Amino acid sequence: MLVALKLLYAWLLPPGIFLLALLVAYCFCRKTKNEHWLVLIFALIYLLSIRVVSDRLIKSLEDWYDQPAVSVIKDVQAMVILGSGSYDGAPDFDGVGQNTESATVRLGTALRLHRALHLPMVLSGGNLFDDMDAEAGIEYRFLRACGVEDRYLIKEDRSRNTAENAKYVKQIYQQHHFKKVILVTSAFHMPRAVALFQREGMNVIPYPTDYKTDKKLRLNAFAFTPSSDCLYHNSLAMKEYLGLLAVKMGWQ
């Protein structure tokens, strides 16, 4: 009964409700010149909103780099944590401005790495608009509240995208004479991040986190049920592949 209710909810919430609306429209528009467009739109939305498609697409990015064991990480001087957006002005435990879900997972991973390796942490992330708080400042406040000493934290608060993350972190990399750093970001984002950091001449060890997929794809009813999460994950993956193309073509 519980499974049946969850499946019902999935079809009554977006995007499922939109697909049902298209089916109803198709019933009224059969044998008209617009019939094939409804079929095409339905198929496109459906395929982009089911887990069996989204998991395969985003997993192709997440599997690009393995997460290394801490015991094999050697000869590194710092770690770089890339921001992933923030909720500007949102009330937080000890201030205002809150990290997004992905940014919080990245910080949680970096915090555990810091406790294991005692490395300086470069927090990279600025603000898109002048009246917003920089991501690095919000991350700094979070890590200080978690007990990380100020001497371990380096803020890079000018970057607005991944290309600028790499550009401005390079200045810190050179200023502190780093030779190798750990790069912490979401697994789906890691291929593009590594490409941009390597283009700037930095030696990085990828440490992916914030995985969006299970280790093994589960083929059950939910894998073929429309979900807004799957639409979002597909958009993330497509954005990353377009970004990789832009890097390769020199557009970014």
Per-segment meaning from a language model:
Residues 51-224:
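A structural signal for short, hydrophobic/glycine-enriched beta-strand patches
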Residues 28-36:
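Membrane-interface helix-boundary motifs at transmembrane edges
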Residues 12-18, 203, 231, 248:
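Alpha-helical transmembrane anchor segments
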Residues 218-222, 230-252:
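Extracytoplasmic/luminal low-complexity segments enriched in Pro/Gly and acidic/polar residues
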Residues 37-51:
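Hydrophobic membrane-insertion alpha-helices, especially the h-region
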Residues 1-27:
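Membrane-embedded alpha-helical segments of integral membrane proteins
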Residues 3-8, 53, 57-61, 238-245:
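Hydrophobic alpha-helical segments of integral membrane proteins
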Residues 25-26, 49, 247:
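Structural signal for membrane-spanning alpha-helices in multi-pass inner-membrane proteins
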